[in-house]
A protein has these predicted regions:
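An amphipathic alpha-helical interaction segment
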Residues: 1-31, 41-49, 53
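A short secondary-structure junction motif
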Residues: 4-8, 61, 85
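Short alpha-helical segment immediately N-terminal to, or the first helix within
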Residues: 29-33, 80-84, 94
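Basic/polar phosphate-binding segments, predominantly the helix-turn-helix DNA-binding elements
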Residues: 31, 37-73, 92-118
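Short coil/turn helix-boundary motifs
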Residues: 33, 37, 85-86, 122
Length: 124
């Protein structure tokens, strides 16, 4: 049925291609806004697509969901701030986490250790 509908519309059957420029606009928005709350609606607006298409395209192009990408970038930023000597609470706030507990939970979930343990490993 899908092939017949595509043929009737004058389009070849198959999947549409991912919109790289839109996904890249969302990615750039993420990088510019890490210290602030970021919603999928904001990303969709920055990309110029609806949230469902953006989510599909983002995953297809970058291999992860927009939410996971934001979380990994925040963890990267928090680690840089911690390595630069910032207290954990300040690093959490600077990287856009709601509090130090949120940073710790996500850090353990992703890396298997607390940020404090990771910091001590850096200095040992």
């Amino acid at each position: 049925l899908a092939h017949a509908l595509c043929a009737a519309a004058g389009r070849p059957p198959g999947r549409r291609t991912a919109d790289y420029p839109a996904a890249e606009r969302a990615r750039q928005f993420i990088h510019a806004s890490l210290g602030q709350p970021i919603t999928l609606d904001q990303l969709a607006q920055a990309a110029g697509n609806d949230r469902w298409r953006l989510s599909r395209d983002f995953r297809a192009l970058f291999g992860t969901s927009p939410y996971r990408y934001v979380m990994l970038r925040r963890l990267d930023l928090a680690r840089r701030l911690i390595a630069a000597g910032q207290p954990l609470a300040d690093a959490a706030a600077g990287a856009g986490f709601t509090d130090q507990s949120h940073l710790t939970h996500r850090h353990v979930q992703t890396y298997g250790m607390t940020p404090d343990r990771w910091r001590r490993m850096l200095h040992s």
